[in-house]
């Protein structure tokens, strides 16, 4: 999604810190390899990422950086400094968060001066059980300017003719039944 949203940049590089959940990194490698996106792992000598670790990427063409908060080692990242560093270089920030941690930690939308560009996570920590062995539910959110690049169907809240609240699929021009060749909804199951 970050590469699609960042079309003006020719970069296909996404930085991923080695303290991001290894399972998430494996899925990202599988998904990215078929799309020509290069995931580059940032080594983790101290268990957390610092702006000093990112200095070698100054001036390089990078599309996005993935930050997990808290990281896989249970450490808290300096999300404000990393987010501001990335945005100063026109690099999108992708936040992977545990939703239960957001009760005490700053939400991705408040990281740094502008907040993360994309936030995602697993709903299992909220007590969502497996159903016949899977799948878990997840969440994905982004800034309004990137909504059209989101995979999957988007449901919006509306009011019907009788004034009752209802829900409907929105932005359907991006759906596979409308624009098959440019659809973003055909890569997910929409279960949940």
List where the protein language model places each region.
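Active-site C-terminal subdomain of aminotransferase-like
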Residues: 125-192
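PLP-dependent aminotransferase-class I/II
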Residues: 16-75, 81
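Short acidic (Asp/Glu) and glycine-rich catalytic loops that position anionic groups and cofactors
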Residues: 7-10, 35, 62, 117-121, ...
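Conserved beta-loop-alpha segment that forms the PLP phosphate-binding cup at the N-terminus of a helix
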Residues: 1-10, 138
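Generic beta-strand/beta-sheet core signal
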Residues: 17, 42-44, 65-70, 92-97, ...
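Short, charged, surface-exposed secondary-structure boundary motifs
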Residues: 50-52, 105, 128-132
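Short, surface-exposed connector motifs at secondary-structure boundaries
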Residues: 8-13, 61-65, 85-92
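Catalytic PLP-binding core of fold-type I/II PLP enzymes
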Residues: 76-118
């Amino acid at each position: 999604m970050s590469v699609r949203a960042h079309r003006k940049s020719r970069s296909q590089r996404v930085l991923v810190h080695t303290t991001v959940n290894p399972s998430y990194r494996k899925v990202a490698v599988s998904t990215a390899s078929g799309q020509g996106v290069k995931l580059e792992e940032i080594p983790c000598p101290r268990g957390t990422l610092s702006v000093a670790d990112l200095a070698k990427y100054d001036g390089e063409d990078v599309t996005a950086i993935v930050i997990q908060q808290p990281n896989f080692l249970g450490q808290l990242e300096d999300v404000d400094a990393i987010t501001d560093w990335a945005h100063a270089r026109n690099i999108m920030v992708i936040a992977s968060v545990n939703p239960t941690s957001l009760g005490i930690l700053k939400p991705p939308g408040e990281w740094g001066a502008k907040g993360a560009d994309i936030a995602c996570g697993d709903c299992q920590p909220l007590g969502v059980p497996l159903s016949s062995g899977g799948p878990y539910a997840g969440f994905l959110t982004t800034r309004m300017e990137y909504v059209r690049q989101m995979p999957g169907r988007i449901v919006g809240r509306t009011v019907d003719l009788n004034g009752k609240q209802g829900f409907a699929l929105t932005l359907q021009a991006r759906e596979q039944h409308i624009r098959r060749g440019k659809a973003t909804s055909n890569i997910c199951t929409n279960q949940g």
